[in-house]
Amino acid sequence: MITKEEAQKIAKLARLKFEKDIVEKFSTQLSTIMNMINILNEIDCKDIEPLTSVSNMNARMREDTVTSSDLSNKLFDNVSGNSAKLAKEVKYFITPKVVE
């Protein structure tokens, strides 16, 4: 059983603030949770293989390949107007002023 003092310490560590009348309820709930965890700890799982997924499907692996991800040239090919050349050089979109 978790005491009120332990419950207050846990609440403080979790940065929770409880009224005094709630601390007893909190300690009871924590005790119940700890009892459930203790029951789970008693289960013998030595011969059970750990799950990596809840489904039986296997993840298909693929070879890692290095590809060029610099799409800026394609992107800036769409820039038109007087600022197109400068936009391609500095790799920025040049727009009219929108905030005064």
Curated annotation (Swiss-Prot):
Superkingdom to which the source organism belongs: Bacteria
UniProt EC number: 6.3.5.-
Protein name in the entry: Glutamyl-tRNA(Gln) amidotransferase subunit C
Source organism of this protein record: Rickettsia prowazekii (strain Madrid E)
NCBIfam families: gatC
Signal peptide: none
InterPro entries in UniProt: Asp/Glu-ADT_sf_sub_c, GatC
Family, per entry: Belongs to the GatC family.
Function: Allows the formation of correctly charged Asn-tRNA(Asn) or Gln-tRNA(Gln) through the transamidation of misacylated Asp-tRNA(Asn) or Glu-tRNA(Gln) in organisms which lack either or both of asparaginyl-tRNA or glutaminyl-tRNA synthetases. The reaction takes place in the presence of glutamine and ATP through an activated phospho-Asp-tRNA(Asn) or phospho-Glu-tRNA(Gln).
Molecular function in Gene Ontology: asparaginyl-tRNA synthase (glutamine-hydrolyzing) activity; ATP binding; glutaminyl-tRNA synthase (glutamine-hydrolyzing) activity
